[in-house]
A protein has these predicted regions:
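Acidic, metal-coordinating catalytic segment for phosphate/diphosphate chemistry
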Residues: 121-220
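DNA-contacting surface of Y-family translesion DNA polymerases
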Residues: 2-146
Length: 220
C-alpha cells in the first residue's frame, strides 16, 4: 500500500486526505476508501455505548513471591494482596465474576490451575480471597513449595446486572463489605496503595507484596 501511495504522489496524511477517494479505491480496493476516510478524520464504524460492549473474558493478577510459599499462611498473605488488586479492578471497571481461578507455579516450575464457581456474582475482596483459599485447600498444594501464585476472575457480568437473591444470603453484610472495599479503593487512589493496610499484610510485608520502605509503620 505504501508503494502504491507513493506512485500516486501521496507521502503525507494531508495529501491522502486531499486525494480522490474513487481513485484510491480503484488502486487499493476498499481499503483505499477507508484510508481516505481515516485521513479526513472520519471513522465509519458504528459508535457503541460502553454498556453494549462485551465484557472482558477475565480480570486477574499474579505474582512471583520473594521466597517460596511453604504453607497456607504464606499463601494467604500473598493471596490477600492479589484479591485486593483483582477486586479493585472489577469494581473500577464495573464487573462482577461468577468463577474464581487459582493458578500456582511450584518451585520446580510446574503450573497448576483450579477453578471454583461462586454462589452469586461478586466483586468483593473477601469473597475472592475465600474462594482462592478454598481452592488452595482442595488442591492439596502442600508440602510442595510454590514459587508464584495468581487469582483470575472469570465469567464476568456487569455489576449493575440483576441477579437472583440467595435465601441464605446476608445482603446487608455484603453491602457493607462492598462499601468498605469502595472506601479503600478511593483512599488508595488518592493517597497511594499503602495508605491503608490490612493487619495481615504487616506480619510479612514481602509476601503481602508491600514494600517496607513505602510505609512508615513498616520501617525499622
Amino acid at each position: 500500500s505504501v508503494r502504491q501511495l507513493e506512485r500516486l504522489g501521496i507521502r503525507t496524511v494531508g495529501a491522502l486526505a486531499a486525494a480522490d477517494a474513487d481513485v484510491l479505491e480503484q488502486r487499493l480496493g476498499k481499503g483505499g476508501r477507508l484510508l481516505h476516510a481515516y485521513a479526513n478524520g472520519y471513522d465509519p464504524a458504528p459508535v457503541h455505548r460502553i454498556a453494549d460492549l462485551p465484557p472482558p473474558k477475565s480480570i486477574g493478577n499474579s505474582a512471583t513471591a520473594p521466597r517460596d510459599l511453604i504453607c497456607e499462611a504464606d499463601a494467604r498473605a500473598a493471596l490477600l494482596s492479589l484479591a485486593e488488586s483483582v477486586g479493585a479492578r472489577l469494581r473500577l471497571e464495573g464487573y462482577q465474576c461468577r468463577t474464581v481461578e487459582l493458578s500456582v507455579r511450584t518451585a520446580d516450575l510446574h503450573w497448576r490451575s483450579h477453578r471454583m464457581a461462586l454462589r452469586h456474582p461478586s466483586d468483593l475482596t473477601s469473597e475472592l480471597l475465600d474462594a482462592a483459599l478454598a481452592l488452595c485447600e482442595q488442591a492439596h498444594l502442600w508440602p510442595d513449595p510454590l514459587r508464584s501464585i495468581g487469582i483470575r476472575a472469570l465469567d464476568l457480568v456487569p455489576a449493575c446486572a440483576p441477579h437472583q437473591l440467595d435465601l441464605f444470603e446476608d445482603a446487608e453484610h455484603r453491602a457493607r463489605q462492598r462499601q468498605l472495599d469502595i472506601t479503600l479503593d478511593n483512599l488508595r487512589a488518592r493517597y497511594g496503595k499503602t495508605c491503608v493496610l490490612r493487619g495481615r499484610a504487616c506480619f510479612d510485608p514481602a509476601l503481602g507484596l508491600v514494600q517496607r520502605e513505602e510505609h512508615a509503620f513498616l520501617r525499622k
